Amino acid sequence: VEDKPANNVLLVGARGTGKSSGVKAVVNSFFDKGLRLVQLTKEQLIDLPVIMEHLRDFSSKKFIIFLDDLSFEEFEVEYKYLKSAIEGGASAKPENVLIYATSNRRHLIKESYKDRGANDDDMHRSDTLNETISLSDRFGLIIYYMAPNQQEYLDIVDGLLKQHGIELSKEELRVKAGAWEKEHSGRSGRIAQQFVTHYLGQVYNK
């Protein structure tokens, strides 16, 4: 937004740790400065060059092309369009466009045991493997989102509850919020928010 050089960004972390929310919060924070979000699915990556050229015409705006929960199976080739776009391809990426992607794994392309096999008859297997693993390295900035530990999770729940004027004792917070995360998919900001929503529903129904 300040017309300075900036890197494409890959946000890596477990589910519910706030990767997507973080990207959307950035766009909301700088909306008044002309920042806009264009969200694509991986199936739309084939159209990425055309989309970027279209965005180039809106030079007064800045765009984040957002790819949420991105990963590829070994047989999918859409990653080639993304790699080409990041590296410049036939035409340079517009100066008003950056690519942000979120993923649950550091290497975006699933690697099979066959890819590692020494007896594979594909003489270019090593080059192919390096190409797929290196996709994430094409992002200039990689940000890791770590799942919260037990105390951090409880602090998140406590903070969310206090926003609604509710304060639980440390023991009640530990028991109730702890039971909730054990019944669900572990500790994360999303799980904390879901517990608070559930708890508020119980309180308001009384």
Regions found by a protein language model. Name each.
Residues 120-133, 140-154:
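Conserved AAA+ ATPase "SRH/arginine-finger" region at the nucleotide-binding site
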Residues 29-63, 70-75:
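AAA+/P-loop NTPase substrate/partner-engagement loops
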Residues 5-24:
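Walker A/P-loop nucleotide-binding motif
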Residues 57, 74-121:
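Conserved catalytic/switch belt of AAA+ P-loop NTPases
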Residues 7, 35-36, 60-64, 93-100:
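Loop/turn-to-beta-strand initiation segments
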Residues 1-3:
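Pre-Walker A adenine-sensing motif
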Residues 19, 48, 74, 107-112, ...:
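Switch/connector loops and helix/strand junctions flanking conserved nucleotide-binding motifs
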Residues 146-206:
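C-terminal alpha-helical "lid" subdomain
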